[in-house]
Amino acid sequence: MEIFDYDNILLLPRKCRVESRAECDASVTLGQRSFRIPVVPANMKTVVNEDICVWMAQNGYFYVMHRFDLDNLQFVRDMQARGVYASISLGVKQPDYDTVDRLVAEGLAPEYITIDIAHGHADTVRKMIAYLKNHLPESFVIAGNVATPEAVIDLENWGADATKVGIGPGKVCITKMKTGFGTGGWQLSALKWCARVATKPIIADGGIREHGDIAKSIRFGATMVMIGSMLAGLEESPGQTVEVDGKLFKEYYGSASDFNKGEYKHVEGKRILEPIKGKLVDTLREMEEDVQSAISYAGGTRLMDIRKVNYVVLGGKNSNEDLMM
């Protein structure tokens, strides 16, 4: 098995078939909807809030609302009242089952539900998937996070409509340091490994540092990528604004950090400051244009044409130089 990550890979261009990158279609389908780009902001308190979710839904982007200190029922009511889709996160504890029961009782069916726990290859996830499929069969269920083909196979067999791949590769995740487990440093290889057995969409979660990493994720089997740090340092980001030496930053912390949990227990995340680097609309537009450029370099016109290109594995501490044809 090859071991590499985003900075070890470059994709090889093919003959261009378009006159302008604007001719390339960067959209992707997930469930019953098509979205403008294969990018979803991480479902974290310092990345998304209700205002961002509403804006994204109204403008053709996918979102997943976080599950912390949130009334999921009220959120679903509000989104449906605005005439946009609802996409929520759940855990696997009793209050999450209670939330499902209350949604059913009120006739509220979120279009997307993400089962969001750190180690998603678990019997607790199997039970929650079964409960959702029994009580909210119309909802599209995303389950994670996982890191192995065995986990992807199990989650799909248990009924998940998509899986989320990535354990600890994110900027504020310290799982690999705290536990010795995870995909930090080889997230792209893990994605490739998992995609070989997947029959349903994969969301690659974590480790994205540059816009080009989106195209690399698509090449190795992702349908969509979940991005945290690059979308945490925006003017609209919910994290607290902090001034350091005259420069403005946004607070960004992991979902398993003590900052998020409010207690120092089972901590696998940390807090950092992200420089404020612009507005959400401009960042997403730039991402779309860069994905369109990637499609043109791939010699294609649609997003999945990127999967047809060859790639080079660059020399690095985790890989050997190699040309994959």
Swiss-Prot record:
NADP is among the record's keywords: yes
Active site: 173 (thioimidate intermediate)
GO MF entries: GMP reductase activity
Entry GO CC: cytosol; GMP reductase complex
Residues annotated as binding NADP(+): 202-225
SUPFAM superfamilies attached to this UniProt entry: Inosine monophosphate dehydrogenase (IMPDH) (SSF51412)
Protein's GO biological process: purine nucleotide metabolic process
EC code: 1.7.1.7
Top-level class of the enzyme under EC nomenclature: oxidoreductase
Coiled coil (UniProt feature): none
UniProt keyword terms in alphabetical order: NADP, Oxidoreductase
Oxidoreductase in keyword set: yes
Origin: domain of life: Bacteria
Function: Catalyzes the irreversible NADPH-dependent deamination of GMP to IMP. It functions in the conversion of nucleobase, nucleoside and nucleotide derivatives of G to A nucleotides, and in maintaining the intracellular balance of A and G nucleotides.
Protein name per UniProt: GMP reductase
Encoding gene, per UniProt annotation: guaC
